[in-house]
Amino acid sequence: MTKMNNPKFTTPSGDTAPRQVWQQTVDAVLAQTKSQAAGLSSADAAERLNTCGPNALPEKKGKPGWLRFLAHFNDVLIYVLLAAAALTAIMGHWVDTLVILGVTVINALIGHIQESNAEKSLQGIRNMLSSDARVQRNGKHETIPTRDLVPGDIVILRAGDRVPADMRLIETHNLRVEEAILTGESTVVDKITDALEGDLPLGDRVNMVFSGTTVSASGGVGVVTATGAQTELGHINQMMAGIEKHRTPLLVQMDKLGKAIFAIILAMMVALFIFSLALRDIPMGELLLSLISLAVAAVPEGLPAIISIILSLGVQTMARKRAIIRKLPTVETLGAMTVVCSDKTGTLTMNEMTVKAIITADCCYRVEGDSYEPQGRIFLEGSDEPVQVQPGTVLETWLRTIDLCNDSQLTQDERGLWGITGGPTEGALKVLAAKAQLPAVEARLVAKIPFDSQYKYMSTLQHIDGNARVLITGAPDVIFAMCREQMSRHGAVPFEAQYWEEEMARFARQGLRMVAAACKPASLDATTLNHEDLQEGLIFLGIAGMMDPPRPEAIDAIHACQTAGIRVKMITGDHPQTAMSIGQMLGITNSSQAMTGYQLEHMDDAALAKAAVEYDIFARTSPEHKLRLVKALQDNGEVVGMTGDGVNDAPALRQADVGIAMGIKGTEVTKEAADMVLTDDNFATIASSVKEGRRVYDNLKKTILFIMPTNLAQGLLIIIALLAGNIIPLTPVLILWMNMATSATLSFGLAFEAAERNVMNRPPRKTGQHVMDGFAVWRVAFVGSMIAIAAFILEAWLAPRGHSPEFIRTVLLQMLVTAQWVYMINCRSSDSFSLSMGLLRNKGIWLVTGVLLLMQLVIIYVPLMQSMFGTEALPLRYWFVTLVIGVAMFLVVEIEKRLTRRFRKTA
């Protein structure tokens, strides 16, 4: 089907340069869309629907569940196990076959359960479209399915409606729209119909409304300019569909480790097969069983399950700290994060507009307090003595004006938490008046002019203690034009525009937004109030400077992140000056300069890559800008975390290595696209999550260092046995018992290790740094060889004493499990003495020790388990022998740690 071009980007005939619909007059837009105020005819609408397609977002069919499950068998180490299972089946060793196949299925199930269904986030966007729309067709009002809307339709909007398509407004009646899902800014937007100038970001296109946003007050009429995939919401949907999530550092490292193990296994098996055929007269069945045992021994089958256990414990810990992890590997990725890109409103700030400064004709004041709680004093600027508000003063008159000319109310819930009803600006003024504790007066509202986006002020006629007064609050530039006088301590004096403009500029540099107030006396006989009544006689009183203040805990959290080598970047839809001011208060490193979305729009990829590193404040940004910034940082080798709450943030969250959604004000779309959800919308939670992520990575590394020597020792034992012509020391099922049962159980103890003291004072690990670094390889080789040599000596001591192969294998099993247990304690620290680290405080170690002892008693002494695993009951003295060997190994490893500590620190 041929699609109509997006009308927002077409050029009317005769224009010499493309003009966007927000830059055109209402008549020009109607002409461009070939529409009229009376609406389209049914025939014209049907033709356009056939040409443009339905007003719906395209759906992409996801992979079926069974195919996603099978994808988890696509791993080189799983191939080794499947081949081993096939060979044991051919040889008739059905117990071995079933156990090996069971291991592969368990690993696949774990991976399948972890896998997130990314299509949910796209479905969430589709669910944001309204179901019906009121339109003007055939000269009359009709209600039609939203899917049937076409460019050129005239749509009627009312309070509470969800906007069904992108529209250019042709008529407004104090229309206010909530656009936070697209812009990220929580304040409602007052809409107009006038044409606008310039290449404006979405948040400044105040003569348009966008699909998925909500009408919060009054109503209006608009002409549809884009539907379906051509809308701003559709554009976000397309970006989401085109993003492929990066693999986490942990998964990349595990892939590399798996391929390295596979290469070693293959080389060893081929070499041993050739050697045994050429130099040893070993029956083919026994040789194949030995090689299968070698393959099973070398594969760390329990590692995926163990990693999942450790990550799951991290998830539970983070949940208690108000961070919900949606995808397990995110826990580890948090520890590798090098950059956090954060939204401003509500995440770094309190999302509670607060008055911080007062400007009057005589002086300026600063105001305490950072929330809606009416606690805080007023100070004369430069003084530490609080001001007592005296009746009849300029300050008292100004405070009384902002209190009475106000539609908001201060509220307190059953928990004692303070809030407001009404808009945030009026709420901030109401809170300030409450802080001042003004003496009670008898006030009665006589008439009111509600706030209107066209006039940019509201006004009331009040009777206050028997006097009539007109009060007005609004935009300073508008009220300036109405005033010829200003109130000072000497009474009414001529208005001094230069003074007010200079003071406003000074406070604007601090990121404050301005609201002005004025008043004039009125007649007690007056019962109405209109705009003409405000054109003369107003006396200017003063200006409130307000801001959404930083969260106190966010300041500490940013400092903690920067100490940990994580750079914090603020990406916001707010104005640059406000963003820089908040950035300086928060302590963001480079907050003296800001990059705007307009500047980003005109950068090529090379310039953007440089700007992404150089700047820490990005203002007036769009979804595309956020997405490009994340990609640019990733191309520079950064591991990027990105916060967001609106639909506009979803593409960047999905692209980021760690997408972080807000749980309170975040949309469902954003939460589905994210890897982590903050239940308190607090940046400080990110810092604590980074600490937990680093702890988890440390414990994962300890676990891998714990598991690998056992696999190496098992493999070396089998190789030595083949070379020496001895019995197979370990059968595949015994190897799987150690790799899946005992290793997993003991690893659980390491999962409970607390974070090391310097965990947030070290830089993030380098991108691409492998978990198996040089010292890790040395430790695995040293410990694995030591265990193998000890087991070989033990086997050589047992063999001449006439014991059965099953008895010898049982003693070797117990010796290897004991070695695992003592080495698990060694692994608590890579260089410190393990018994000096609060062994009694880690209850997990004692729990797994008890479970391990029970498991070994069952496999050695229960007849059913003896027949399944080929074990025999052991006399008590052999438990003592294996324990002595284990203690000796523990001491050797502790000595090795002491000797190599100096080399590790200088490496």
List PLM regions with ranges.
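A C-terminal functional module that forms or caps the active site or interfaces directly
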Residues: 827
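Membrane-water interface at loop-to-transmembrane-helix junctions
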Residues: 766-785, 805-811
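Generic alpha-helical transmembrane segments
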Residues: 742, 787-788, 810-824
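C-terminal substrate-binding/catalytic lobe of Rossmann-fold NAD(P)-dependent dehydrogenases
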Residues: 794-797, 801, 805, 817
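Conserved cytosolic headpiece of P-type ATPases
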Residues: 1-761, 771-772, 785, 796, ...
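Loop-to-helix transition at the N-terminal end of transmembrane alpha-helices
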Residues: 734-738, 806-815
